[in-house]
């Protein structure tokens, strides 16, 4: 596996007036997964002062569709989530904790890996047993579930919900933006209908624009019926008029970040 580091002082190339990537990033190329039987790329975005205090540990946010998160040059349609800018802005304003962000690149199996399928189960196992294990061993993380979140949009939002729901002992926070809750004939809702155990200790961020309006509202209502409390267990947001793309998710990224990691 090759590792490429991009430090703050080397990242001043601009893309249409804005800096491509802000902060310290380590790119991990072609990490072999025994579980998936393929090589995967991911990046680890580190807090600005990560190297200044060797004793400090940080919460971690795992995100899907890694190529779309911090660099418009690698992102779909040339627009990224601006995760690096938003986290930096909020931490500099002392509104949220410093965190580590791990962005897992997708591949041709994205649809199946992000769903409740055999490949989806393998992807979840890869995240926990291989990727998270590697990140926790190499970086100064707060590895417990209370300091570990997962987030994505569209199918990545569905994946985040499923991963946290099935593994609350690992992920206690799930950011589900414009999620594809409709996928596979509303299977995720059938799963919730069949659940009769005590409420799982997970914080959910649920949002949508005009896309997914009915399913997003349905998920919020269903979780509320199951005992999840708005403002404590759930943050719900309807972005009126918003389309289904990276630019829109970038505009409201501060909401889940503050809900999960706000001071």
Model-derived segments and their meaning:
Residues 2-263:
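Non-catalytic cap/lid and distal C-terminal segments of serine-dependent acyl enzymes
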